[in-house]
A protein has these predicted regions:
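Structured, contiguous alpha/beta core segments that scaffold functional sites
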Residues: 1-59, 65, 69-267, 374-409, ...
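A contiguous, surface-oriented mixed alpha/beta subdomain in the mid-to-C-terminal portion of proteins
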Residues: 181, 187-347, 358-365
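Activation/maturation switch segments at domain boundaries
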Residues: 281-289, 322-417
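Generic structural signal for bulky hydrophobic/aromatic residues embedded
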Residues: 110, 301-303, 351
Length: 417
């Protein structure tokens, strides 16, 4: 169809976003269970984490709180080696991030040759897991592991290729026939039979909106707060000439580098002058600014962060005093961080007792972070849900004793007798 009026709109390109369904669908031949409608729900969570500054800050702050000052134990040296390449603190940090980001975590359990104990534990990225469909008893027998689930061609047949590893679920009673198993923690979530949901699942749309608000402001700047001008020419140019004029205008006036540029035209007669018509702004920038504040508050609420000052975000009307920040952080620790820690510690203790059966019951804790150098508890250790009463106090006393010894050694080095 001919363009009768030689009119062309200069459009900005926007990428289509596909939101994965939270429902779980099985493949046609029941070989594995898709993680979201398009089998890419973990990828969606990763994109939100990478593209929303508020959301990623919340996740990182909580993960830092979960990790704390690191793992501690009264049993010496057991935390030094989870596998030949990593210690338990390395594995613990990765598990903590997966737990917060996806709502669950997983690691590979490798038995020794005699199958009498666990020889090594390796973290497995939770986004790589796809569950085998439940058996008739409602139990998941194992998981397929791959980092290529997004390859639609590779998985277009709805079946798992033969080269994709499969690990049976952790069961020490089957160690003889299954030397490698997978330990998966997935808390109960209503309506979810196979995969967990992150605790911020109710804010997924709001987090996506945060990314779009930033995208609006970025494109407004890059496109010269467009469209602010309508330029009409009377040259009866052909399509190639119109495209050349459009490219020239974009290069000369679009973007922040060209702000305040001078518009200069040299024409052979006034009759050929273009018509330049200002387009009034609709006030969308103010609307998106207000929307951004609402989005920030909703994301903080989803992560159960009562005070944005914990993240370094200043809120109008709040004084931001030291005591207020400490109180808000302690509330976050007790209601959010501590439950994460206790769950992770329970899993780690179970593995350590399988690695060192001769040591009996093993107690592991996490030394909590301190916001300030003084004014808080000197040492606070969180232990697992399986820990006996008083074990946290014992670990705290040992840490304080070790710190005092380290301080004494430091003073002796500075002031030798």
């Amino acid at each position: 169809m001919d363009n009768k009026f030689n009119f062309k709109s200069i459009k900005k390109a926007f990428a289509d976003r596909v939101r994965p369904s939270e429902s779980i669908y099985t493949s046609k031949n029941n070989s594995y269970v898709k993680y979201g409608e398009f089998n890419d729900f973990p990828r969606h969570l990763i994109d939100l984490y990478n593209n929303s500054s508020i959301h990623s800050t919340c996740v990182n702050a909580i993960v830092d709180g979960i990790v704390g000052e690191g793992l501690v134990s009264s049993t010496s040296d057991i935390l030094d080696r989870a596998n030949p390449e990593e210690g338990w603190n390395d594995v613990y940090r990765r598990l903590a991030l997966d737990f917060k980001l996806y709502g669950g975590y997983a690691f590979e359990v490798v038995y020794n040759k005699s199958r009498t104990r666990v020889a090594a534990v390796y973290h497995i990225d939770f986004s790589w897991l796809r569950a085998k469909e439940m058996n008739y008893r409602g139990k998941i027998e194992g998981y397929y592991i791959s980092d290529e689930w997004g390859d639609k061609y590779r998985y277009s047949t709805k079946t798992v290729p033969e080269d994709v590893p499969f690990l049976p679920v952790y069961n020490p009673a089957k160690a003889q026939e299954e030397p490698k198993q997978i330990y998966v923690y997935r808390p109960y979530a209503p309506g979810q039979k196979y995969y967990p949901l992150p605790d911020y699942v109710g804010a997924l749309r709001v987090i996506d909106l945060d990314e779009e608000v930033d995208n609006f402001h970025l494109n407004n700047i890059k496109n010269g707060l467009a469209p602010s001008l309508a330029i009409t020419t009377f040259t009866n140019a052909d399509p190639d000439q119109r495209q050349a004029i459009e490219l020239m205008l974009r290069e000369q006036y679009q973007g922040t580098d060209n702000a305040g540029s001078l518009l200069y035209m040299d024409l052979d007669s006034p009759e050929n002058a273009p018509v330049i018509t200002p387009i009034p702004q609709n006030g969308a920038d103010g609307y998106y600014t207000t929307l951004s504040e609402l989005v920030t508050q909703k994301i903080l609420t989803a992560h159960r962060i009562t005070s944005p000052m914990i993240l370094g975000i200043k809120t109008p009307g709040q004084l931001g005093g030291r005591d207020e920040i400490i109180d808000a952080y302690l509330l976050l620790v007790n209601t959010v961080i501590r439950p994460y820690q206790q769950t992770l510690l329970t899993s780690i203790e179970e593995m350590l007792e399988m690695m060192y059966p001769e040591k009996g019951d093993i107690s592991v804790g996490v030394q909590q972070l301190k916001l300030f150098a003084d004014g808080e508890e000197e040492v606070d250790v969180v232990t697992s849900t399986e820990a006996e009463v008083g074990e946290d106090s014992e670990l705290e006393a040992e840490i304080e004793k070790a710190d005092e010894a380290a301080d004494a050694d430091s003073n002796n080095d500075r002031f030798p007798i």
